[in-house]
UniProtKB/Swiss-Prot annotation:
Highest taxon, organism lineage: Bacteria
Pathway(s) of this molecule: Amino-acid degradation; L-arginine degradation via AST pathway; L-glutamate and succinate from L-arginine: step 2/5
Species classification: Bacteria, Pseudomonadati, Pseudomonadota, Betaproteobacteria, Burkholderiales
Protein name: N-succinylarginine dihydrolase
Single GO MF descriptor: N-succinylarginine dihydrolase activity
InterPro entries for this protein: AstB_sf, SuccinylArg_d-Hdrlase_AstB
Gene that encodes it: astB
Active site residues per record: E174, H249, C370 (nucleophile)
Entry annotated with the keyword Nucleotidyltransferase: no
Pfam family, one: AstB
PANTHER family xref list: N-SUCCINYLARGININE DIHYDROLASE
Enzyme kind, highest EC tier: hydrolase
Organism of origin: Paraburkholderia xenovorans (strain LB400)
Residues that bind substrate: 19-28, 110, 137-138, 213, 251, 364
Subunit-level organization: Homodimer.
Length: 446
């Protein structure tokens, strides 16, 4: 059946800030305590969505989560009215207020792992929200993610939204940031590719400096849950040395689309074996496989991490050609810029490069790929999605005006103690659910 890939980008929330919460994420740590601009962050992300929609891509939006999370703070023993709780946490445990206020749900590549209906044993699209149990500020996301996905993809004849895996390090799951899918055509059966950093029960190399967040056991559990066939599933271990260099998810060192894998030379343990298995399993589906492996001599791992070359979107345009969507930092790094010029000058799967200003997200370690969740949908499935979430001229205008009305243009870490920020955020989110047609999505609306 004819199908296409839709991208659902996370709308940056009103509490976007730089608290340095993500150990192993170099940009997050380097920009700790900087002053953020939530309004600019949200508009940068929205402009990317609009430009891609204008180019003919199916582009949706996922709403922010409620922050600060008063549920978390109350579960951690703080009581009183909301203002009292915020004041107490700010005084006694400011690091918990920072975690409860994080806008990290904007990076929807970590929202869930998605398998299209062509791959699953029951012919439905499967979603497993990621437990994100390696970081407190992200481990609180999956319940809201599940509620949002079940609201947007509510036709249970076509969609299955599972619970997150149990939140233990043995099943640490970071979602689609460590998953991609290869196929000849989106609607055809494909090979799903799961990348992990460590195994709880198998011996193997592990990073020494920064933690590996994705376990093999989690990847395998998601594949089993989604009803994927063994002959169309590949597991690969991420190179622990690149994790120690700041590659905290596989989408910082590799990106795939249809029958093309674009990756760094040092992305994987035993890369040739990985490529061979992908090629063999795709061949069994009568699909080709292309690898564009970037040599370390041309783009070092450090350059890849600082520019986010691989945290890009690789998209198939309506004319069948592929385009790479990169952050502007790629043009500001002379070695990466030279590589991209060479890439598009030669004959190959990637014909063009689109550059976006995503500076506010990038300073927290999130490029174009982090901001989007890929969902392959056929025509009937796409028609079953809540209609108000698709980006077009009208929705863009309404969201742009909504951001202008509700978002601050300056947010320092000290501003998280302001009880008015919670009220501002709730007012904004209440209006947003009406714009998107999502009903009473948030706890404060129920």
């Amino acid at each position: 059946m004819q199908a296409t890939e839709a991208n659902f980008d996370g709308l940056v929330g009103p509490t976007h800030n730089y608290a340095g919460l993500s150990f192993g994420n170099v940009a997050s740590q380097n920009n700790e305590k900087s002053v953020a601009n939530p309004k600019a962050a949200a508009k940068q992300g929205l402009r990317k969505m609009k430009q891609l929609a204008d180019l003919g891509f199916h582009q949706g939006v996922l709403p922010p989560q409620e922050r600060p999370s008063m549920r978390l703070l109350r579960e951690l023993g703080f009581s009183g009215d909301d203002a009292t709780v915020i004041a107490r946490v700010a005084r006694d445990a400011p690091e918990l207020l920072a975690a409860a206020s994080s806008a990290s749900a904007m990076w929807t590549a970590n929202a869930a792992t998605v398998s299209p209906s062509a791959d699953t044993n029951d012919g439905r699209v499967h979603f497993t929200p990621a437990n994100l149990c390696s970081k407190l500020h992200r481990a609180i996301e999956h319940e809201s993610t599940r509620r949002t996905l079940r609201t947007m993809f509510n036709d249970t004849d076509r969609f299955v939204v599972h619970e997150a895996l149990p939140g233990t390090p043995a099943l640490g799951d970071e979602g689609a940031a460590n998953h991609t899918r290869f196929c000849e055509e989106y609607g055809a059966r494909g090979v799903e590719f799961f990348v992990y950093g460590r195994s709880e029960y198998r011996r193997g190399p592990e990073p020494k400096r920064f933690p590996a967040r994705q376990s093999f056991e989690a990847s395998r559990a998601v594949a089993h849950r989604h009803g994927l066939a063994d002959e169309a599933t590949v597991y690969a271990q991420q190179n622990p040395d690149v994790i120690d260099a700041g590659v905290f998810h596989n989408d910082v060192i590799a990106v795939g689309n249809r029958n093309t894998l674009f990756c760094h030379q040092f992305a994987f343990v035993e890369p040739n074996a990985v490529y061979d298995e992908l090629r063999a399993k795709l061949s069994g589906l009568k699909a080709a496989f292309n690898v564009i492996e970037v040599p370390d001599a041309q783009v070092s791992v450090a350059d890849a991490v600082s520019s986010y070359l691989f945290n890009s979107q690789l998209l198939t345009r309506p004319d069948g050609k592929q385009v790479l969507v990169v952050p502007q930092e790629c043009r500001e790094n002379p070695r990466v810029a030279a590589y991209l010029d060479d890439l598009t000058s030669r004959t190959g799967p990637i014909d063009d490069v689109l550059v976006f200003d995503l500076r506010e997200s990038m300073k927290n370690g999130g490029g174009p790929a982090c901001l989007r969740l890929r969902v392959v949908l056929d025509d009937a499935e796409r028609a079953a999605v809540t209609p108000g979430v698709w980006i077009d001229d009208t929705l863009f205008g309404r969201l742009d005006a909504w951001i202008e009305k509700h978002y601050r243009d300056r947010l320092a870490p000290a501003d998280l103690t302001d009880p008015h920020l919670l009220a501002e955020s709730r007012t904004a989110l209440d209006e947003l659910t009406q714009i998107l047609g999502l009903g009473s999505l948030y706890d404060f609306q129920r």
